[in-house]
A protein has these predicted regions:
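Amphipathic/hydrophobic helical signal segments and adjacent flexible N-terminal regions
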Residues: 2-47, 135-143
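Short loop/beta submotifs within extracellular cysteine-rich repeat domains
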Residues: 46-48, 64, 106, 123-125, ...
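N-terminal glycine/threonine-rich, aromatic-flanked beta-hairpin/loop signature
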Residues: 48-95
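Repeated polar recognition positions within modular binding domains
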Residues: 49-51, 108-110, 130
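A short local loop/turn or secondary-structure capping micro-motif enriched for an aromatic residue
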Residues: 72-76, 105-108, 132-136
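Acidic, glycine-rich flexible loop segments
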Residues: 90-119
């Protein structure tokens, strides 16, 4: 009987420690959680109301992608296929920062995103801003 109780206690301790480790890891975010292909939807709500869809990849904190906006340039051409590069970081609490720098591709603006990853680490919500005084909301999903 003592052996049965002892073996049951040992198995219970092992299972409890594994469950605790799983749930501790589940709640924290790491750089690897950003890696992959994402699609983001934005809505500017302050200076020049418009929407945007951006598709991008993140690898080792480096961001590359393109955006389509519901705006036109001075000649009336739609602002679609705009390329950008940037950087992304994430904290253990799953708050993240991401930049979209359009300047290397002839567009004079950088957008900064302040995001919160969902606990499944496959979606986010947040806000963004740029140097022109634009302010908006953002949400996205990992593909």
């Amino acid at each position: 009987m003592k052996r049965l109780l002892l073996s049951t206690a040992v198995v219970s301790l092992i299972l409890c420690s594994q469950a605790q480790a799983f749930f501790e890891e589940e709640g924290r975010c790491q750089k690897r959680n950003l890696k992959g292909q994402w699609v983001s939807y934005q809505a500017e709500v302050k200076a020049n109301p418009h929407t945007g869809v951006c598709k991008f990849s993140i690898e080792n904190g480096k961001v590359e992608g393109t955006c389509d906006f519901s705006l036109t340039d001075d000649q009336g051409n739609p602002l679609t296929g705009l390329q950008f590069t940037g950087e992304a970081t994430v904290q253990e609490d799953c708050s993240a920062e991401l930049t979209m720098d359009f300047t290397p591709f002839g567009r004079p603006f950088v957008s900064t995103f302040h995001l919160q990853l969902h606990r499944n680490k496959k979606s986010f919500v947040g806000r963004w801003e740029n140097a022109f005084g634009a302010l908006g909301t953002a949400n996205g999903v990992k593909l």
